[in-house]
Amino acid sequence: MSALDNSIRVEVKTEYIEQQSSPEDEKYLFSYTITIINLGEQAAKLETRHWIITDANGKTSEVQGAGVVGETPTIPPNTAYQYTSGTVLDTPFGIMYGTYGMVSESGEHFNAIIKPFRLATPGLLH
């Protein structure tokens, strides 16, 4: 664990995209807007992403790759980077979590933790 691991805060907002979902075909589309906030003293570049996505049936998929939405943004200190992406589940509920592989201005590699967040159709959870 690096001292820089806590220098990045990740906030998530999710939305169920009803008009592009097809529950009768077990296809539920969710968008998620991620805000990555650099609380550290150095710029940090997002190099990789690693997601674990689990639906209500326990089916898990893993997504790994370079950057996010085709970008590898450098986030200066005390600023934020935001993007929106999406995923399709076979169930009306699921959970996502993961990490961003980051590198600091000084060349130190560290992980920014993405805490588990829910993907759920409206009215499903009280």
Curated annotation (Swiss-Prot):
GO terms for biological process: error-free translesion synthesis. Pfam families: DUF525 (PF04379). PROSITE patterns: APAG. Residues 2-126 form the ApaG domain. InterPro entries: ApaG_domain, ApaG_sf, Uncharacterised_ApaG. This is Protein ApaG. It comes from Shewanella oneidensis (strain ATCC 700550 / JCM 31522 / CIP 106686 / LMG 19005 / NCIMB 14063 / MR-1).
